[in-house]
Amino acid sequence: MWYHRLSHLHSRLQDLLKGGVIYPALPQPNFKSLLPLAVHWHHTASKSLTCAWQQHEDHFELKYANTVMRFDYVWLRDHCRSASCYNSKTHQRSLDTASVDLCIKPKTIRLDETTLFFTWPDGHVTKYDLNWLVKNSYEGQKQKVIQPRILWNAEIYQQAQVPSVDCQSFLETNEGLKKFLQNFLLYGIAFVENVPPTQEHTEKLAERISLIRETIYGRMWYFTSDFSRGDTAYTKLALDRHTDTTYFQEPCGIQVFHCLKHEGTGGRTLLVDGFYAAEQVLQKAPEEFELLSKVPLKHEYIEDVGECHNHMIGIGPVLNIYPWNKELYLIRYNNYDRAVINTVPYDVVHRWYTAHRTLTIELRRPENEFWVKLKPGRVLFIDNWRVLHGRECFTGYRQLCGCYLTRDDVLNTARLLGLQA
């Protein structure tokens, strides 16, 4: 499973937001009794946990905190946190990794309470806290999500009654900002209310959490239905669900929308949790989910309108997952901007179309559609790596402004406020 269904884990939500997955302190079985006599395991016991470890020819094996871990000896030497190997003030490695013997093995290993000591052939001593090894081992990372999320359809989101944050609280207090970011990280969308309906105030709001990402559309964009750019967004037509800037090699992470004025009808905004839809595909057709996560596609944006001349190309699969824990972190879905499919062999193309159709059916289910009317004073933030957006057609004069934010900076702000991101 590539995510935690937090809607069933409300009692652990605060722990997840502060520090990730909580590993229970369960006693370990007697591994020694399960192994041939020729294998020698070292055992220690604390008040709550037992530890067993063995030195192999090419790696070190550790059983602790309900986790079986294996560490390459070069890895253990490379990650030494001694003063000569790691600068704790700058949090940067001082050791020259290329200087480590690729055949290195420790001369001795000993355990003192919950600290392992490795003595290397040159006499250097590396020490590791057992909990640090659990947290940073490959096996430990497989059990941990990078970012906790609550997946939703329209009913789930509406029943959650996720509160908006007032503009003044957002701008002037860390409490308001943290509340906003917590909602945004969990659901992929969040609202700020009572914002003065101007481009300048919208910009000030965005800069509270991130640097604004300047693109071919400028720093802050402001548009009506005048088709001033070669994009369907600059019309009154309906837009099907999609993610933006799929034609960038790294799509923009967050987008901000503020409707400054609308003198007419229609124009509601459509929001769909792409991760919820992808989870349905994973449950119903796992082989199709896997195909969508492996086949790279081109998306492109060709513009030749007035003084705007651009040809952007981005390449990547529809679904992007972390390989070690299978956590989905990015959906790249835009049928408007998908380029010619020439990166897929003929014997895979039809299977890809089938998988794409399965995902599209889930994305288009009416129960997955959350519709909202944007209005002056209400600013919408969207996780463009997760939530698809669209709109219904509209009449009359409509002004929107907004921008893209750098994802790294938004997540940086969240971490500095103590959130898991």
From Swiss-Prot:
Its cofactor is Fe(2+); L-ascorbate. Keywords: Acetylation, Autism, Autism spectrum disorder, Carnitine biosynthesis, Dioxygenase, Disease variant, Iron, Metal-binding, Mitochondrion, Oxidoreductase, Transit peptide. Binds 1 Fe(2+) ion per subunit. It is an enzyme of class 1 (oxidoreductase). Changing residue 369 to D: In AUTSX6; uncertain significance. It catalyses: N(6),N(6),N(6)-trimethyl-L-lysine + 2-oxoglutarate + O2 = (3S)-3-hydroxy-N(6),N(6),N(6)-trimethyl-L-lysine + succinate + CO2. All isoforms, but isoform 8, are widely expressed in adult and fetal tissues. Isoform 8 is restricted to heart and skeletal muscle. Residues 1-15 form a transit peptide. GO terms for biological process: carnitine biosynthetic process. SUPFAM superfamilies: Clavaminate synthase-like (SSF51197). It is linked to Autism, X-linked 6: A form of autism, a complex multifactorial, pervasive developmental disorder characterized by impairments in reciprocal social interaction and communication, restricted and stereotyped patterns of interests and activities, and the presence of developmental abnormalities by 3 years of age. Most individuals with autism also manifest moderate intellectual disability. AUTSX6 patients may respond favorably to carnitine supplementation. Homodimer. This is Trimethyllysine dioxygenase, mitochondrial. It comes from Homo sapiens (Human). The gene is TMLHE.
